[in-house]
Structure formats: C-alpha cells, structure tokens
Design a protein with these regions (language model features):
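N-terminal Rossmann-like dinucleotide-binding module
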Residues: 1-42, 46
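Short, structured coil segments at secondary-structure junctions
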Residues: 50-51, 101
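Short beta->alpha connector loops at strand-helix junctions that form conserved
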Residues: 55-60, 108
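Conserved acidic residues
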Residues: 32, 82, 103
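Donor/substrate-binding cores of folate-linked one-carbon enzymes
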Residues: 21, 87-200
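Internal anion-binding site segments
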Residues: 5, 120, 194-216
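N-terminal glycine-rich "phosphate-gripper" loop used for MgATP/nucleotide binding
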Residues: 36-37, 60-61, 65-69, 79-95
Length: 216
C-alpha cells in the first residue's frame, strides 16, 4: 500500500478527489498526513472528516525557507511517506524537500505545460485566446511548474469562456488524471529519463484527452 503525504493551502478539491479514489478502491493507498501553510484552509475540514492527521506549519514561524522545508521533509519521513501530493499548495517547494523526495513529489497545474505556468493558468489561457486548454500532472523540481510531465488532459476553450467557466471544465479533468498518476506510481509503472516520464501502460492512459469540437 502506498503511503501519501498531502500539502495544501486552500480548499483541497484534489485532496478530496484522492480521498474519494482511495475509498472507492481505485487507489491502493492511505493518506498519512495533511500539511498546510494556512490555518483557515478548507482542506483541514476535509482531513478532519476523514480522520486524517493535520499539521499546520506556518512559514513565518521558521527562521528561513530551507528550515521550513527540512521540517516538512522530517515530518513526512517520520510517517514513512512514499509520495508527496501537492493539492493546491501555493508555494514554490524548497530544495531540502525536493532532494529528499526526488521524483516523489507530484503537482497538478491547470494548464497544458509548458504553456501558462505559475498563478492563474486558466486566466492566462483565456486572455491568450487559446482553442485548447487543460491540466498537467508533473513531478516537482526547483522551478515553477517546470518538472517532468507525467500526464496531461485537454479540454476545449471557447470564445465566450471566462476564467471561471474554463476553470470548472479543467477541474473535472484534474480530478480524473491526478488519481491516475498516483495509481501509475503506486504500480511502479513510471520511470523518469531526463525530461521524459516513461509510462508502462496502454497508450490511452497517458495521452492527452482530445477535446470535442468547438461550438460552431
């Protein structure tokens, strides 16, 4: 069984998606701990409702960034965490955590990387006028949404889309492909080779999902 540690800053809808997929039996995993940098995060309520241990770790209570991430890494190691899930963790992860969990930290980003990294990927896509948008599960490195790509899924982007309408469409795919990425990892079917993530699977499990035709 895979042991997960989750980092979240806000509502934690992807955290809930992982919980639901564990309960359904799709994922052979358990969540050992939720770590949040926000004492008001709704993710805390989700953890409480599912009897998941929660640690509220506020960066300003640590002398500097590295000590904060060393402490997080220590807490995860204490609980024998195999894979770290970033479920809306709104900080750039520090080197001490990345080094101790190399290729064992996954993030989901609401855009088709390498396009539109950073904050508000959906808004960037709407303003740019793209015809296809989507989401990306990737391993975390020291950059901002620059780590090796694991899975992507695409959705149509319409001319009358707002940030909210596009976000809603993308979020449904986030809740589908993040659990899939965790499942592939748990089954030992993911290998990293340079910038490429190789997946031992049927092709349809790893490709971009083709969006339907636009509204014409």
């Amino acid at each position: 069984m895979l042991t997960l540690g989750v980092l979240a800053s806000g509502r934690g809808s992807n955290f809930q998606s992982i919980i639901d997929n564990i309960k359904s039996g799709y994922l052979n995993a358990k969540i050992a701990v939720l770590i949040t940098d926000n004492s008001d995060a709704y993710a805390i309520e989700r953890a409480r409702n599912n009897n998941i241990e929660t640690l509220v770790l506020i960066p300003k209570n640590f002398p500097e960034k590295d000590s904060y991430y060393r402490h997080i890494a220590d807490e995860l190691k204490k609980r024998s965490v195999d894979l770290v899930i970033l479920a809306g963790f709104m900080r750039v992860v520090g080197r001490p955590l990345i080094e101790r969990f190399k290729y064992r930290i996954m993030n989901i980003h609401p855009a088709l990387l390498p396009s539109f990294p950073g904050l508000h990927g959906q808004k960037q896509a709407v303003e740019y006028g793209v015809k296809i948008a989507g989401c990306t599960v990737h391993f975390v490195d020291e950059g901002v949404d620059t780590g090796p790509i694991i899975i992507q899924s695409a959705v149509p982007a319409y001319e009358d889309d707002t940030e909210d309408s596009l976000s809603e469409r993308i979020l449904k795919e986030e809740h589908r492909i993040f659990p899939l990425a965790v499942k592939l990892f748990s089954e030992g079917r993911i290998k990293v080779k340079g910038r490429k993530v190789l997946i031992e699977s049927k092709r349809e499990e790893a490709v971009i999902t083709n969006p339907p035709h636009s509204k014409i």
